[in-house]
């Protein structure tokens, strides 16, 4: 028997850990990448009390969003799963969600056209899952709704 889900908010951020869990690599690692983004609602307004988790097999990191919806991580590129390209699974937690949402983050410098999941999406869906190189970092904005909505997956 499944227990019904309930929304996360409105006081979701109160329970967030205050320790820094946003690094999968030390900033001094020559292979370290800075990953930044914003969690945005359907009107493009930052969601201030969300939490983003990224997963790569056994590795994971977590970042709460700030007052503008910004989040950030220090990562190294993950090893690809068999038949895939390097990527992170991205879990989104925010007020108003009955269940956390799952999406993926792909890297712009990989042969993403060979990934079977990306190949199954239309051009717009694929575009929402590939981070953009910007000012020495990777940017990955997550749009929960609207014209620029990020592609999410059932889980």
Over which residues does each language-model region extend?
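Beta-strand-dominated extracellular/periplasmic modules and repeats
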Residues: 1-128, 133-155
């Amino acid at each position: 028997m499944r227990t019904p889900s309930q929304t996360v908010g409105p006081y979701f951020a109160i329970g967030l850990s205050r320790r820094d869990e946003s690094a999968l690599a030390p900033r001094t690692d020559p292979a370290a990448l800075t990953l930044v983004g914003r969690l945005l609602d359907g009107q493009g307004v930052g969601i201030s009390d969300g939490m983003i988790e990224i997963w790569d097999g056994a590795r994971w990191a977590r970042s709460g969003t700030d007052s503008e919806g910004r989040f950030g991580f220090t990562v190294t590129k993950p090893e690809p799963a068999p038949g895939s390209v390097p990527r992170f699974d991205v879990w989104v937690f925010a007020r108003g969600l009955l269940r956390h949402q799952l999406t993926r983050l792909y890297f712009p410098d990989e042969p993403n056209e060979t990934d079977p999941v990306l190949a199954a999406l239309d051009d717009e869906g694929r575009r929402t899952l590939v981070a953009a190189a910007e000012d020495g970092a990777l940017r990955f904005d997550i749009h929960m709704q609207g014209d620029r909505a990020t592609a999410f997956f059932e889980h």
